[in-house]
Amino acid sequence: MMKQSIYPGITAEDDPDIEVTYPEESSSSAGLWAEVKSITRDIIFAAVMAVLIVVFVVQPVKVEGTSMQPRLENDERIFVNKFEYTFSSINRGDIVVFWYPEDPTKSFIKRVIGLPDDNIDMDGSGHVTINGQPLDESYLAPERNQAARLRWNQGPYTSGHQVRVKPHYYFVMGDNRDASNDSRSWGLVPEKYIYGKAMFRYWPLPRIGSLNSTVDVDDER
């Protein structure tokens, strides 16, 4: 008697080394449990990856205050890339997040204006010069730059006194020059205090988008 064919045209007698088995049907409860375990595993993996990304790469940040208007508004949410400066340099125009030099328990967000070895000054109208060359700051709103020069004179720097940026330090200012507590008031930011670059605004939705920007200056030293 010929044994039952497993596949059309093939029987267990065609090859004596073939062992034919018939898997038992799993119970519905066992199948459901396996599915639950699989989903749970995937959720845990995704959560772990999310934590690693937040800890080592990207951090969500809430903007508090108006010192970066009009680029950033109070209560907006942004993503900060904490990995950006591991292999790349800090550039002029970068919007950075750093530990406040006078109280490292606090974080500030400002724009990088002066790089190491730069000579910085501000003229009577509030325009910044770097190494004697004017800095293109098209991102500023003129109505928020009326008292910028006064703030310069009230800080550690006075009219006619250039700021020399030391190696491994940076000079930062808020885009809202009339309402920003920045390097004009408390000096330079150590490079080691800068821990991220503002990359993307994700809230509010109407203003969602990249925060990358550059500024131009003729770096003749």
Which sequence ranges carry the predicted segments?
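Hydrophobic membrane-insertion alpha-helices, especially the h-region
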Residues: 41-57
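Soluble "head" domains of membrane/secretory-pathway proteins
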Residues: 2-37, 56-62, 70-221
